[in-house]
């Protein structure tokens, strides 16, 4: 500790690193709490307080020089970005994607089910006529892959994605076959769809 406090640049680095860790845990804990992951939030809060007790006391007592203040502020902002990035990579939970399509020639609901997604579809009416609306459940980490798949199948589809607060009842989560969703590549979607159509026709 004395080595760090005796060297001003070591102190700047220590303040930056400690604050990055502290705010990363703080950001993750806040996001997990809002998403309802109470036990994970509690575990992260333990690490957050541990960093606070061990390091932040030393940091706060050293904010009497301009370089330390800048290091503290920069570490705070980087910590928020790192925390959000980690949570994004973890991609916990599910996403619901609503797709409105006028494409009836391709059986989009069954094609998406064959790719591993849970799909509920129904008829609707828009300004320009009949539409098919699909409510698709996907693990959050595959949200972008699903949206690219839908655009490849119907480039004019209207897509809205949102994260449900809670899922209860039904068979949605069981209807999502994660292995199948993970297995296919978006670039090969046309060949995958053609293969599934051939199998079904037989």
UniProtKB/Swiss-Prot annotation:
Keyword hit for Hydrolase: no
Location(s), subcellular: Cell membrane
TM helices/strands, residue ranges: 8-28, 40-60, 66-86
Keyword hit for Transmembrane helix: yes
Highest taxon listed in the record's lineage: Bacteria
Keyword set, alphabetical order: Cell membrane, Membrane, Transmembrane, Transmembrane helix
Pfam short name (any one): DUF2179
CC terms in the record's Gene Ontology section: plasma membrane
UniProt topology in membrane: Multi-pass membrane protein
InterPro entries: DUF2179 (IPR019264), DUF5698 (IPR044035), UPF0316 (IPR022930)
Signal peptide: none
Family according to the record: Belongs to the UPF0316 family.
Name of the molecule in the record: UPF0316 protein SH1041
């Amino acid at each position: 500790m004395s080595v760090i406090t005796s060297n001003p640049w070591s102190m700047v680095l220590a303040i930056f690193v400690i604050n990055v860790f502290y705010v990363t845990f703080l950001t993750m804990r806040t996001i997990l709490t809002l998403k309802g992951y109470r036990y994970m939030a509690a575990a992260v809060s333990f690490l957050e307080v541990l960093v606070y007790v061990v390091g932040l006391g030393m940091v706060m007592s050293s904010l009497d020089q301009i370089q330390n203040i800048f290091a503290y502020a920069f570490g705070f902002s980087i910590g928020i970005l790192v925390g959000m990035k980690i949570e994004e990579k973890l991609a916990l939970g599910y996403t619901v994607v609503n797709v409105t399509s006028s494409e009836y020639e391709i059986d989009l609901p069954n094609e998406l089910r064959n790719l591993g997604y849970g799909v509920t579809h129904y008829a609707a009416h828009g300004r320009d006529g009949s539409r098919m609306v699909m409510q698709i459940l996907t693990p959050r980490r595959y949200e972008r892959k699903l949206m690219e798949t839908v655009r490849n199948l119907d480039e004019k589809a209207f897509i809205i994605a949102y994260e449900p607060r809670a899922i209860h009842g039904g068979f949605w989560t069981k209807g999502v076959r994660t292995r199948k969703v993970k297995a296919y590549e978006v670039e090969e979607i046309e060949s995958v769809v053609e293969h599934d159509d051939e199998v079904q026709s037989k």
